[in-house]
Curated annotation (Swiss-Prot):
S-S bridge residues: none
The protein, known as: UPF0410 protein YeaQ
Pfam family, one: Transgly_assoc
NCBIfam families: PRK10457.1 (NF007771)
UniProt lineage: Bacteria, Pseudomonadati, Pseudomonadota, Gammaproteobacteria, Enterobacterales
Residues that span the membrane, as ranges: 26-46, 57-77
Keywords assigned by UniProt, alphabetized: Cell inner membrane, Cell membrane, Membrane, Transmembrane, Transmembrane helix
Recorded GO CC terms: plasma membrane
């Protein structure tokens, strides 16, 4: 899946990650989007790295990977910030 697809997934994944893990994070909506994009890209890369198959296209599996990646990045961001 191209980087543009991961950015779009990241936008949505960031919003969902924030919804799943509510809390006060600096940066507001912009930070949520940025963490979602980073999480989606990292999630896709890790999924491929660990042999879960190539994540490509707009499908449910890719979306789940993007959301999980965004949640992990949000968790790490909060741990570093606190």
């Amino acid at each position: 899946m191209g980087i543009l697809s991961w950015i779009i997934f990241g936008l949505i994944a960031g919003i969902l990650a924030k919804w799943i893990m509510p809390g006060k994070d600096g940066g507001g909506f912009f930070m949520t989007i940025l963490l979602g994009i980073v999480g989606a890209v990292v999630g896709g890369w890790i999924s491929t790295l660990f042999g879960f198959g190539k994540v490509d296209g707009f499908n449910f599996g890719s979306f789940v990977v993007a959301v999980i990646g965004a949640i992990v990045v949000l968790f790490i961001y909060r741990k570093i910030k606190s």
